[in-house]
Amino acid sequence: MKLNNASLPDVSIAKPSYDRSEIGVGIVHFGVGGFHRAHQAMYLDRLLSEGKAKEWGICGVGVLPGDRKMATVMDDQDGLYTLILMNPDGSRDARVIGSIVDYKFAPDDPEAVVELIAAPTTRIVELTITEGGYVTDDAGPDSVFGLVTTALARRKERGLPSPTIVSCDNIEGNGDVARKAFTSFAERSQPELVEWMTANTRFPNSMVDRITPVTTPDVIENLSADYGIDDEWPVAAEPFTAWVLDDDFSDGRPPYEDVGVLLVDDVTPYELMKLRLLNAGHQALCYFAYLAGYRLVADAAGDPLFAKFLLEYMDTEATPTLRPVPGIDLPKFKQTAIDRFANPSVRDTIVRLCFGSSDRIPQWLVPVIKENLRSGEPVRLSAATVASWARYAEGVDEQGEPIDVQDNLADSLVPLAKSQLDNPTAFVENTALFGDLAQQPRFVEAYLWALDSLHRDGARATLEALMNADDR
């Protein structure tokens, strides 16, 4: 049964109980992928199911060539898709999500996107454009920044309030990063708009959390076999979800607090906790795991040695850099994170975690290292993680098989990593990624030890040595 509005009454799993034709667009979301559909769109679907937020429906927008597939699927399925929660015991909870009521592929009609954002009914613009998506140097008028800035100028001319711009990407101070990016773009393209944006446009910081693997063919096949639903692009995710938002909006917001979103005055403590424990923990795991032969995150996290390494990193190096987090049991959060990684039903891949490392390590791990160098706290496990990335980036595993290093900077990183066989600090001398870490003796000593051990003894033996050492 093809999933769309016509077939929705016949769907046997949980589905929208609300009339989607009555839902107005109040949120424009750039970057509709698996995570947005498992997270922000899911929260809004919950509100709609409670008879709330009918003016806050989502219109997704794609700006990249690769977004055309999503545009086609959204059109074919009237914006409907299935969210499947993968429980650790092997059971699954499936629901059709209906909160995305429209989708526009910007390259086909950029003017329509601009007018949508400029419409008085649009009050929030959301972003999931990845950690590397906030560089505006080469951004043009048809980019996210160009489209939104043009729309803001029209709202200014029409005397309309500014929409709130909400970044939902895993970046420390994501709202601040978004503000800087949009302001920088406006200064070059429409300088007369900057003062109005500064006075009127809000960019709340946010913390988002849900492990959402890439949708694989077996997810699609199982959905059809188990429930009779033909969904071209369902989403599978873990049961855990969290969203913490600065309560700072320009023109209203949905009552997110009614469906479990935490609205706070300062999201920073929650954000640092998540990025430095969970996200950086993913990076601490993934390169060692790949080199040791693991290909699924759950298998690696279920290995007692790897779990011990993760908890040790969290306890001794990440935690000292955190601020007090109101209402959070930190030891429980850390153990829950490892348990989430080890969920065998969430078939998240090591390769996904390794993807785009040049955007991730500088955002999530390098700040931990720098803070601990300043404060005198340990850095050996963080330095070993950087060394494991450098070893992975050489492009050959421990069996001599090629590694497909998927990174925007792969063309420069792979040769740099290979050159460390002659110049051991070559990789970390990249100041754009690591700042001055190559000039920090305590970091360099720990890094060189780990890199030498990885080359000489391999990933598993290196972890064993790290876990058996009192200090290094």
Annotate each predicted stretch with a short phrase:
Residues M1-R472:
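Substrate/ligand-engaging "lid" and interaction regions
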